[in-house]
Amino acid sequence: MECPHLSSSVCIAPDSAKFPNGSPSSWCCSVCRSNKSPWVCLTCSSVHCGRYVNGHAKKHYEDAQVPLTNHKKSEKQDKVQHTVCMDCSSYSTYCYRCDDFVVNDTKLGLVQKVREHLQNLENSAFTADRHKKRKLLENSTLNSKLLKVNGSTTAICATGLRNLGNTCFMNAILQSLSNIEQFCCYFKELPAVELRNGKTAGRRTYHTRSQGDNNVSLVEEFRKTLCALWQGSQTAFSPESLFYVVWKIMPNFRGYQQQDAHEFMRYLLDHLHLELQGGFNGVSRSAILQENSTLSASNKCCINGASTVVTAIFGGILQNEVNCLICGTESRKFDPFLDLSLDIPSQFRSKRSKNQENGPVCSLRDCLRSFTDLEELDETELYMCHKCKKKQKSTKKFWIQKLPKVLCLHLKRFHWTAYLRNKVDTYVEFPLRGLDMKCYLLEPENSGPESCLYDLAAVVVHHGSGVGSGHYTAYATHEGRWFHFNDSTVTLTDEETVVKAKAYILFYVEHQAKAGSDKL
């Protein structure tokens, strides 16, 4: 939408000396001194925290709108001020009076000039920080923010994601996907979306919400988020633009209540796939995939039509084999999948900790075996036998016909019992390297010795007792180091800590792909 309040609210000089010193993304709220989600008022240049922190930016606007009850309003007094502010991290502009993000500018282009000035300040601060880190590397090998890896000292550059109000489910999935190298690199190399019409023609889009409902691009906001996560210019990134697009195209996730991370991941991958099928930023899907010449036709597993990078990387194929127990008729069906949902076998569900000594520990192999074992269907799942011409008792078995490049395994920790959805808090042992999937293949003899091996890339963990509550974090490996992602906080961790986690979603990367022999 075009905001009608810019002319009266945007009064600040683009290069105003009133701006604080340092990096805009780390400016502190003038009230609570928090450096999370800073917003600058475009009327007076004061900095306040966003509504997801302590809401002082909104209170600044509200305090400025106290009506003049004892005086007749002049035309000047009637003008609305302090209504427009700019996010110091994403440079998106918001009007509290319109209660919406802003796409237009003043006649003199002041909004764009302020945006460019903030970018220059950010770049200058980043350059200064790089010089400082270089000096630290030269003068000292012991620094709290430096790590010794393979004999050389390197700086930690991982970026956290700010929690916008129970959005840890989204943050954990985004951090996990950002560490799937093939997947992440593909999106980061896509061209940026630009507006090509109206007053903002030729200008970069900073907030998808400004483009209107018909132009929101999940791919573009996902791309921008991935680019921000590993550039190292800030400690935490605010994914508000992506969150808004998620609200627009995935109504199930509207609001600020806790959501299921696995459900969000499936919706996200499905919608990325559908948007890429339709082409992106004027580049057809086929042209994008054609650039990645190492993707063979056999790897482009199709789900709902033509293949995209989503199905090329996460797509596998299951064979569902059903046998009638009365006449012996066999039915086979091939189903594509992006992830496998595994039950935790019932005999392990009372075992909550790895350190408990009563009975064997549940392993990921136990869950996979339960998924692929021959199963007799109960009375509520009778099979319609075409030979018997009626529903009959039957058995079912899954085989994996084709393994994906990235194997995503979801442990079904939430189950309905009566009217409640309870959590299975059992510890499940999982390997960091060398997960062998050969014994679950339909034709294992046709697979190579290395093609069935997988190494762990990321783990999503749910902390708490219920799907509608608790908290999500993620562990992921990047360049040989393991990180723990807890919203805006990123810390280095070790393999021993990772393997003790009660995994909810596991991302395994094909062994050859991770070794770098197969580049997307």
UniProtKB/Swiss-Prot annotation:
- Molecular function GO terms recorded: cysteine-type deubiquitinase activity; histone binding; histone H2A deubiquitinase activity; histone H2B deubiquitinase activity; zinc ion binding
Write out the residues that bind Zn(2+) 3. Answer: C41, C44, H60, H82
Annotated positions binding Zn(2+) 1: C3, H5, C95, C98
What is this enzyme's catalytic activity, as reactions? Thiol-dependent hydrolysis of ester, thioester, amide, peptide and isopeptide bonds formed by the C-terminal Gly of ubiquitin (a 76-residue protein attached to proteins as an intracellular targeting signal)
**Chain positions found as N-acetylmethionine:** M1
Please give the GO cellular component terms listed in this UniProt entry. Answer: chromatin; cytoplasm; cytoplasmic ribonucleoprotein granule; Flemming body; nucleoplasm; nucleus
Residues of the signal sequence? Answer: none
The UniProt entry, under PROSITE patterns, shows: USP_1 (PS00972), USP_2 (PS00973), USP_3 (PS50235), ZF_UBP (PS50271)
Binding of Zn(2+) 2 occurs at C29, C32, C49, H56
Q: List localization entries.
A: Nucleus; Cytoplasm
The record's section on Pfam families has: UCH, zf-UBP
Q: State where the UBP-type zinc fingers lie.
A: 1-121
Function in brief: Deubiquitinase that plays a role in several cellular processes including transcriptional regulation, cell cycle progression or innate immunity. In response to DNA damage, deubiquitinates monoubiquitinated target proteins such as histone H2A and H2AX and thereby counteracts RNF168- and RNF8-mediated ubiquitination. In turn, participates in the recruitment of DNA damage repair factors to DNA break sites. Required for proper progression through S phase and subsequent mitotic entry.
According to its UniProt record, which protein family does this protein belong to?
Belongs to the peptidase C19 family. USP3 subfamily.
Q: What is this protein called?
A: Ubiquitin carboxyl-terminal hydrolase 3
Q: Which organism is it from?
A: Homo sapiens (Human)
